[in-house]
UniProtKB/Swiss-Prot annotation:
Cell membrane found in the keyword field: yes
Name the record gives this protein: Immunoglobulin lambda variable 9-49
Residues with Phosphothreonine modification: T98
Annotated segments matching region Complementarity-determining-2: 69-76
Any one of the GO BP annotations: adaptive immune response
Source organism per UniProt: Homo sapiens
InterPro entries assigned: Ig-like_dom, Ig-like_dom_sf, Ig-like_fold, Ig_sub, Ig_sub2, Ig_V-set, IgV_Light_Chain
Region (Complementarity-determining-1): 45-51
Subcellular localization(s) per the UniProt record: Secreted; Cell membrane
Gene Ontology cellular component list: extracellular region; immunoglobulin complex; plasma membrane
Length: 123
């Protein structure tokens, strides 16, 4: 029976490494030109320390990295060409992307994704 504690330890380590965060994002948001909008990406319970990447995807184009956000705000730097009107904030399980003074070129789909070491989840 000496193997039982070892087996339980291995199972708990494997279970922890295979678990993945689930991300949820409201289906849509809209705002007028010149206004501001805040988009929310929510991590599943137990993943409050995870960082989330925000991406912008214009019709017919591939995703473009906007910036990474953790509980302390931006992590690293913004993606190439992302204006200062874009900002992020992290609080608890929520990761926010705010766009101020919305311009026509901001009209896009915005997705969030979390890298959990064994792959990535996107919504």
């Amino acid at each position: 029976m000496a193997w039982a504690p070892l087996l339980l330890t291995l199972l708990s380590l494997l279970t922890g490494s295979l678990s993945q965060p689930v991300l949820t994002q409201p289906p849509s948001a809209s705002a007028s030109l010149g206004a501001s909008v805040t988009l929310t990406c929510t991590l599943s319970s137990g993943y409050s320390n995870y960082k989330v990447d925000w991406y912008q995807q214009r019709p017919g184009k591939g995703p473009r990295f906007v910036m990474r956000v953790g509980t302390g705000g931006i992590v690293g730097s913004k993606g190439d060409g992302i204006p200062d009107r874009f900002s992020v904030l992290g609080s608890g399980l929520n990761r926010y992307l705010t766009i101020k003074n919305i311009q026509e070129e901001d009209e896009s789909d915005y997705h969030c994704g979390a890298d959990h070491g064994s792959g990535s989840n996107f919504v």
